[in-house]
């Protein structure tokens, strides 16, 4: 694309580096900002800069937080002995929205993925193992997405925990509530039969 | 959505005010920025701010420009007596990409649209009429998109020009090059028959 303005070109170039945003979309977004009051652009720039410069990770669970210890870890009514291992803050938000979990989290910050150059040392696996070795945790719940990378990460952590007396579990895989069996994929349906639960348990909440 | 961080919430709120970007996409973009080097966020913020604060409109054609007179208007090899009326810079870029047009442009900055509260006074119609009255222009080419708003705007300008000796034209509507007649809509096909051109003209470039 040939731009009549260097300023416009720079803004579009920077914008189009965001994932899923091409040059055309970037141009549309930037032209939208030009039509809005200058304040909107100022606030957007300020919010992004402040976030990037001042954001902290919770000292205990490595979730994104404004304080040294995040709200969840600082809440005394939550069970600190149960820890749910997740990939990032989006998973924490999804589980929190269910209202079904009262334990702590441990945010890995990604999954082991040699293809993307992400090894165990780039993730917060070491602090998790240390917490376990310090005897602070009774149970670890693996809640990573069930992809090749997710399974690899689960297995790596599981291996690291060998020799400790900790209880490990993983979230149940099965047919979604409200789904038709007919349209479910074989792997999920197969797992939901193998891991069937006593009927009386399914009537709780 | 409940965020564990006010900074994150603010950034997502500002980001999701852009058109076509919802809360979830905004969160994905913001988390992406957090994973990239701090420099990327700094440059994005800077580029957006500089654009918004320093951008100029060309004194002659009202296109976005870094200088008082844009490159096209300042180019002496272009024909200043023919003016193509377009909606915004994207249309200028599209026509420039064809390499078929050597005249000037006049960027309206929008279309007359009472539904969105945009009247003739918010557009650069007055300066266009003044240029015509000053006798600087021989021909005006209307190149707005053929929607209700585009047609209204064309007609409004056409009416304003009544009494002047200026030649007006509009870009040809018809079947796209390479398209099958079978799948063309009736209005376009009808227009392309009514406005048929001598066959020998169609063989030029």
UniProtKB/Swiss-Prot annotation, chains A, B:
Source species, domain of life: Bacteria
Location of the Toprim domain: 81-176
Molecular function GO terms recorded: DNA binding; zinc ion binding
Gene3D superfamilies, A to Z: 3.30.60.80, 3.40.1360.10, 6.10.250.240, RecR Domain 1
Family classification: Belongs to the RecR family.
Keywords: DNA damage, DNA recombination, DNA repair, Metal-binding, Zinc, Zinc-finger
GO annotation, biological process: DNA recombination; DNA repair
PROSITE patterns the UniProt entry points to: TOPRIM
This protein's name: Recombination protein RecR
InterPro entries assigned: DNA_Rcmb_RecR, Rcmb_RecR, Rcmb_RecR_Znf, TOPRIM_dom, TOPRIM_RecR
Zinc finger intervals, C4-type: 58-73
Pfam families reported in the protein's UniProt record: RecR_C (PF21175), RecR_HhH (PF21176), RecR_ZnF (PF02132), Toprim_4 (PF13662)
Described function: May play a role in DNA repair. It seems to be involved in an RecBC-independent recombinational process of DNA repair. It may act with RecF and RecO.
